[in-house]
């Protein structure tokens, strides 16, 4: 259908308002079946157009459905049939200038429309209609597609303005401080907000998972780690590694292996995954597999003190002490401030009864990390074990002064005071340790053992039960059951003692002490056959660990590029450095033997002579730690301890 603007006859005479009217003609294209005989005219008033225009009837074809509007803008005529015939070649250009081609489809108006609607332009009406339709269309809102309440809450949190990235670091530090003060609920709230704002960052998942694990909320921690792996698309090796450690703690060894493998796939340079996986295999007795994993860790991650330290411990267990010392030396070269390496090396020397060398290594450990609680604890227990009770007490007090919230130091100090001082002071120290960390099982076990030795069997049973209520599947629980079994054995409850021994072995079947204690019980009852059967069961079920030195051949290519040099270092009798080390240790032993026959001097002077290092503990405390060696007993006063405990509980 076509329409044209055609002026009426009355428009030929100009008017003062310079107005005229046009008629809108609708023409139907020529169709063989139905030809249009007369046009339909609709009168439209126009303004500002003078002159006469008339209808031009172009030739139509059945395919031509375009809509034309011809308007004569001036008296001279922009487009007319005469000009069209005269200017045949310029027809196209004139048409483009004078003819307005309307390509927007229009709807036919019915006869019932009012004259006011007829005066409006059709394009404006269509635009207005489309605008109304667009207003009625719903805007895409992501939260409508989320059904669960947790998803809607997460979407609402993401919809808010996202804080700067520096706020994540500050929040993580604040949560760490709160967790250190045992304010786990506040720390959890902060970390949950971090996860809501930064779901792609793995650090909040790791921190929150560790807090949940400390509270024995292992199922929640597992769900959190799984969610973290999904949010990070499996690319965060730290979450995989923490999840693997959790599964290993729960006893799911196969699942833990799969997760450690996933951690190494996510990042083959993640040394903690290789090291944790190796420790798992060591506990399972797969020494060759553990060595292979540690070798891969060195290959992909480079020199690392923790891997060297674990390899050294394996060598020490196998009886290859010179290789163990060499690997410990490599660990301290990698990181001279690694307190763990110095302590492990010192324990090796203690096993070999080379006490001066061990003291020198303990000095290195506290100098590398002056506030490390493990260094002061191990050193203090060592000194007390070799007979230096006063020095051991002093070292434990120093560790407590530097770490007043650590329960292990107070536990060891309490046992030391019970053995060499009074039970009341020991009881106060153990009670304080249990208040610092109520979920620390060894504290309750030690306290129960002390009460049993004092004859308070009922109190001892309650304390043992309290320890088992924390977690009944750990190695500490196994030791607790063994100690409780001894209590029942001495009390005459033999059936209860047998049940407790059996429960302890169900947790840790490799406990030599538990097997032999049970066998001794049966032997004391006159059942020698049963006692021998129990001993045979231990030797039959124990894990046989076969370890040889064949792994060194393939391992040398990784630990040092200079293969020949390392071979010489590990070759007994041909290494000058090892010979010098052996000579030095022998000289230390001779010094120790010669000093044992002399009169004892002051503790500080005796230490300087034994170690030969000139290390003065009192000077070190004053200069490096700002502690007065004469005022270490202040924090251990019973009244001060009670006030501190009450303030700590009220603050929490």
Swiss-Prot record:
GO terms for molecular function: mRNA binding; single-stranded RNA binding. Disruption phenotype: In hcf107-2, reduced accumulation of 5'-end-processed psbH transcript, as well as psbB translation, resulting in disruption of photosystem II (PSII) and seedling lethal plants. Specific loss of processed RNAs with a 5' end 44nt upstream of the psbH start codon in the psbB-psbT-psbH-petB-petD gene cluster. Residues 105-121 have a biased composition (Basic and acidic residues). Pfam families: TPR_14, TPR_16. The keyword Phosphoprotein does not apply. Induction: By continuous red light (Rc at 8 umol.m-2.s-1). Transmembrane segments: none annotated. GO terms for cellular component: chloroplast; chloroplast envelope; chloroplast membrane; chloroplast stroma; plant-type vacuole. Its main location: plastid. Keywords: Chloroplast, Membrane, mRNA processing, Plastid, Repeat, RNA-binding, TPR repeat, Transit peptide. It is a peripheral membrane protein. GO terms for biological process: mRNA processing; plastid organization; regulation of translation; response to red light; RNA processing. Gene3D superfamilies: Tetratricopeptide repeat domain. Residues 1-68 form a transit peptide. The keyword Membrane applies. PROSITE patterns: TPR, TPR_REGION. It is found in: Plastid, Chloroplast; Plastid, Chloroplast membrane; Plastid, Chloroplast stroma. TPR repeats lie at residues 168-201, 202-235, 237-270, 271-304, 305-338, 339-372, 374-406, 407-440, 441-474, 478-511, 543-576, 598-631. Residues 1-21, 78-121, 585-610 are annotated as: Disordered. May form homomultimers. Part of a multi-subunit complex in the range of 60-190 and 600-800 kDa in chloroplast membranes. PANTHER family: PROTEIN HIGH CHLOROPHYLL FLUORESCENT 107 (PTHR44917:SF1). Involved, directly or indirectly, in the processing of chloroplast encoded mRNAs. Exhibits sequence-specific RNA binding and RNA remodeling activities, probably leading to the activation of translation of the target gene cluster psbB-psbT-psbH-petB-petD. Blocks 5'-3' and 3'-5' exoribonucleases (e.g. polynucleotide phosphorylase (PNPase), RNase R) in vitro. Necessary for intercistronic RNA processing of the psbH 5' untranslated region or the stabilization of 5' processed psbH RNAs. Also required for the synthesis of psbB. This is Protein high chlorophyll fluorescent 107.
